[in-house]
Amino acid sequence: MDSYFKAAVSDLDKLLDDFEQNPDEQDYLQDVQNAYDSNHCSVSSELASSQRTSLLPKDQECVNSCASSETSYGTNESSLNEKTLKGLTSIQNEKNVTGLDLLSSVDGGTSDEIQPLYMGRCSKPICDLISDMGNLVHATNSEEDIKKLLPDDFKSNADSLIGLDLSSVSDTPCVSSTDHDSDTVREQQNDISSELQNREIGGIKELGIKVDTTLSDSYNYSGTENLKDKKIFNQLESIVDFNMSSALTRQSSKMFHAKDKLQHKSQPCGLLKDVGLVKEEVDVAVITAAECLKEEGKTSALTCSLPKNEDLCLNDSNSRDENFKLPDFSFQEDKTVIKQSAQEDSKSLDLKDNDVIQDSSSALHVSSKDVPSSLSCLPASGSMCGSLIESKARGDFLPQHEHKDNIQDAVTIHEEIQNSVVLGGEPFKENDLLKQEKCKSILLQSLIEGMEDRKIDPDQTVIRAESLDGGDTSSTVVESQEGLSGTHVPESSDCCEGFINTFSSNDMDGQDLDYFNIDEGAKSGPLISDAELDAFLTEQYLQTTNIKSFEENVNDSKSQMNQIDMKGLDDGNINNIYFNAEAGAIGESHGINIICEIVDKQNTIENGLSLGEKSTIPVQQGLPTSKSEITNQLSVSDINSQSVGGARPKQLFSLPSRTRSSKDLNKPDVPDTIESEPSTADTVVPITCAIDSTADPQVSFNSNYIDIESNSEGGSSFVTANEDSVPENTCKEGLVLGQKQPTWVPDSEAPNCMNCQVKFTFTKRRHHCRACGKVFCGVCCNRKCKLQYLEKEARVCVVCYETISKAQAFERMMSPTGSNLKSNHSDECTTVQPPQENQTSSIPSPATLPVSALKQPGVEGLCSKEQKRVWFADGILPNGEVADTTKLSSGSKRCSEDFSPLSPDVPMTVNTVDHSHSTTVEKPNNETGDITRNEIIQSPISQVPSVEKLSMNTGNEGLPTSGSFTLDDDVFAETEEPSSPTGVLVNSNLPIASISDYRLLCDINKYVCNKISLLPNDEDSLPPLLVASGEKGSVPVVEEHPSHEQIILLLEGESFHPVTFVLNANLLVNVKFIFYSSDKYWYFSTNGLHGLGQAEIIILLLCLPNEDTIPKDIFRLFITIYKDALKGKYIENLDNITFTESFLSSKDHGGFLFITPTFQKLDDLSLPSNPFLCGILIQKLEIPWAKVFPMRLMLRLGAEYKAYPAPLTSIRGRKPLFGEIGHTIMNLLVDLRNYQYTLHNIDQLLIHMEMGKSCIKIPRKKYSDVMKVLNSSNEHVISIGASFSTEADSHLVCIQNDGIYETQANSATGHPRKVTGASFVVFNGALKTSSGFLAKSSIVEDGLMVQITPETMNGLRLALREQKDFKITCGKVDAVDLREYVDICWVDAEEKGNKGVISSVDGISLQGFPSEKIKLEADFETDEKIVKCTEVFYFLKDQDLSILSTSYQFAKEIAMACSAALCPHLKTLKSNGMNKIGLRVSIDTDMVEFQAGSEGQLLPQHYLNDLDSALIPVIHGGTSNSSLPLEIELVFFIIEHLF
């Protein structure tokens, strides 16, 4: 035992030395994680693609890193396992030094089939130093020795091993890998491990390769379990048992980082879904997780699951000191791990299986101690598993009895956990768990039914933090954990996570959990007893007492940030929580974990400060509700340097569950490396973040990168490296990129794009980035940027472009105060602050904590609500002040349909108010494994649990303000961000006038996909629902898949409030029930068409009796209008849209006629901004009239429904008002068959008929239109269509009865008929002088017919050409007293257009000013945002309208120059509520000026400066070509680029 332990310590010391000497190479978290993944993934890399696919469902592929690694490592595992197994004594006969303790005993699992896949992942070794050491020793000494240690039957006893391995491995893999890298670096001498690493992790540095063979084996083993390869499992199991404990200990300690946990949370779902995805992406773990999340997209399960785990969370303020609370067992919701439903054949473990249960129980035991570490390990696979676990999971992992020696050692997990898993041999019963659910100890309720059915039901998985009772968590983590052998503990912790996860919601519902039974064989196997190990480590354990306080301090600071999540947790617990992922893990795992923790990158035993890169305080966003989830990730990696032989004393952590208050400190203390340099720590973080951001904004909880490097015995110190790392690294990378010529990657070494992995072909050519030298496809390398070494613009990839842009923006932001912060950033990122003893303040001093680019962990956590501000990317606040650089944050967008994470290829930087929601996402390059960039992602708006809950989301409640808006009362299907008490939109401080305010679209793109249509394809599903009160500071929330029943309940609620649907990121539709003219109508109104230059649309559709579903065809109509507007095809007054297929469940519905409301009643309608049109449903037989003579149809509708001039309502199933075309004068004037020609209509030309005279008023400005009519008509007939006259009190209406067209008059209600309008006039020059008439005038249908002689026709033509008035006298030649007169008058018609339109510059009315639409030849786009100039208004000053033709070209030039000047600022303008901008240009002989504003307020000066430099040259160049004076106003909209 002694020699064993010493050897382990010695190895650990060496590893630590290596880490300290080569921190860069070892990027702790990433490298380790990558290595771990690589070991387990590399082996599976080849198998992964095939096996993963076959073994796991698509969703599971997400489970990926675990699953894929599991699959692929199947082959490698078998070999590795054989070797390692040989080194390991049979579980039955011996206890490994690393002792599987609980984990080992768990290995009693009957088979990998029995054990759930998730469990497999979770079972990965946690980094048990001792275990690892043992493995190393065996590996290094000889395979034969190992073989000797293991009985023959050990191999056959794969089940037991499997159980252990699965639980420990799965958990450890992702997180552990990070820790393992450092810890097991040396241990991993086995060729197999190196192979695995090499395969899987190209990007991972040597650290990954160094991962203990045992770790890789155990990791692989987990994979094998998933693979269903019993043989492999058996072999691995033995190996794992031995290795796992040690590996697990280390891994668990490191992996326990919040980051890892976060990853697991978000990953679980994603992982389950895409096991395959992980295979290549150890480095890209984040991406994988994100992808998984995407696939799971809709499954909020991860997040939801996490909350339950929170319930389960170990936070037990009471047990804090004495008991190890399962670190964030809430995290373990991920562990809920799937007990992959028993259904899953090979992968799902039989929950009932004693062996499996044993594993889980052991895992639980271990986790109780090792929870932090094991959790950290779990994050990659275990947590993922937990997230993945579907509440559906039929198979529940029933912890088997693990009452064996190991169990005794196991520390009792919180009572809650105990309820579910009773260490000390008591069976876990689900009923107990249910009871304890209240205590927060409830594990994720849902287990994944089957590995194949990896999708987690978001609703099912959702666990509410509220349900957690802080007090209940008091259940003590069994102190006996110390008793558990360190190795066993780590393994157990992993297993525990998995097993805890195994408790499915179903189990919670009351199914009894099987006892976690530890295999006797497994117990007998260990070389060193738990008691011996505990005794040996006791002194060291005592040394970690300071760690607790340190962690508490950290937790306090973090807790402020996460108080929202903490809602259900006790404040005391929060304080008690240890954030040391490593130290925490270590404490739980005892000596082993400590050792692992020691491995932490900067762990300096000498100082007694183990600078655990992992000491990061992970704020697990998995579930905002999962308070315990906040894994006490701050690792108390500061295990006393006093530890003997370099081993860190194990320390019990009473980890009160608490909301993850800080970002995942996934990143190592090492400053972020330049994009070309792989940063394992960074990679790990990205994995967690990606998953988090993808599946849950909450996951993207990492608001602060706080590395609490170590909390040494003497005191605790915070390492701030990670916090600034994002902005700082970005800045550094941006500064470095382009300074010198990069190394050119040869074409031969890049068969695929190094960003999107697309294969290069003859047509898809290679492009080298001039900034980084890598090879990309044309899509990924389509940017241009000025590089210093070239002194000119050159082609760069999208990643370098973003990095350089961010660096430039960051520098611009640096003010006198900002620059100081900047310098502090770098210092804090790389240095460990001196330990501060007895630091009890819950708010760490600024010097102690890293200055987060996202937020300051201390004060802002408390005052997040008051501190929320909006600022521009370049650091300017809306009021012109300089923004504090420490608050720089960004927003993330998520797809409403696929919940996909940000594309690794498309960096998004968005200013957001909510620091606590940001997550750091790094993009590892699939080919090189290098992290090409760091990204801070924040999603201020997410979905809210339920409409009823909406109001509460804005309060200081533990529930995230933004989570998926589940109309369901109780469920927060997906809480994306456990954010500050009030998740505020970026533009929250901008007053939103109403649901029709165009500014409401400013942030929609952050919550939905950039798809042109978000309408589901099926008939029943509805588009995403946006719920917003329209009040200042209100928090919009999005429900991805609302149901008709829920919508009806909302619509029929009090006051008939409208609901808003998101048809795409640029178009909203408000729906409401209204009573109009005593009937009930569906009222639809759009918001967003103005951005394309299209008038908004309203539709009033009569409700059918007992109609309880929204007519979705209306949404399709709006999408059609939107697409037409994109093409420049606009709908205006009296235009139409027709259908060729059934519409609104009837083939008789022909389309819509659109009119501009005039005399109609609009008082009770929530109208959109002007201009807008009203759509009226028409029948198929009415289509000809809508096309050739729409005014006739409009007026006929008015006569039918007693409305003047027309109704605004649409009635389904009505009889058509016109039948087959009969004998009508229109047959002579228009083509009613093929629509080849129609009646020439002159806008604003009016025909007024009174007694004895008729007047045809022709606007002078329409002279050109009149000339067109004359030139196109024959010499005998002139026909002109008129406009509807608002000056007339009645109008002629044509009615068809039995094929005969008759004339009626329809008048406005309550007005006497004096002036009657007509729809057209026909001058017929065929009247013969011999007829005895001078001229004849008569009413024909709804128009005026004037018959004149040829001579009179010639005079009329001449008068029209010369723009002179003309009078026609009608009547008989001899009847002087009975004559009538027809006057043709040229009038200066008053401009009545643009009614209700106001200027964005200063708010003045634009009514009466002529305008015309502008169509630019090209769009100006940046960051997927387009600036569109839609219209120009002319402020004429006694000028002839003829100048408009020349002014239009000048206006286009101004529009292009302005668009180019605004382009760099589109994102900041839009995010700050300025998505509609007006530009007014005034030019005179001695004066040139312009004004730019939005919503009546001038733009900030720095925007005007850019406009000045762009516009002045254009204005001066255009003055000579335009008539002066000239004053115009251009309207610009900033919209999203949709696909």
Curated annotation (Swiss-Prot):
CC terms in the record's Gene Ontology section: cytosol; early endosome; early endosome membrane; intracellular membrane-bounded organelle
Swiss-Prot/TrEMBL keywords: Cytoplasm, Endosome, Membrane, Metal-binding, Phosphoprotein, Zinc, Zinc-finger
Coiled coil: none
Residue spans of biased composition, Polar residues class: 472-484, 816-845
Zinc finger (FYVE-type): 747-805
Disulfide bonds: none
Membrane topology term: Peripheral membrane protein
Biological process per Gene Ontology, one example term: vesicle organization
Annotated compartments: Cytoplasm; Early endosome membrane
Entries under InterPro entries matching the protein: SARA-like_C (IPR022557), SARA/endofin (IPR035438), Znf_FYVE (IPR000306), Znf_FYVE-rel (IPR017455), Znf_FYVE_PHD (IPR011011), Znf_RING/FYVE/PHD (IPR013083)
Residue numbers of Phosphoserine PTMs: 123, 446, 815, 845, 896, 939, 946
Biased composition annotated in UniProt, kind: Basic and acidic residues: 661-670
Stated role: May be involved in regulating membrane trafficking in the endosomal pathway. Overexpression induces endosome aggregation. Required to target TOM1 to endosomes.
Record protein name field: Zinc finger FYVE domain-containing protein 16
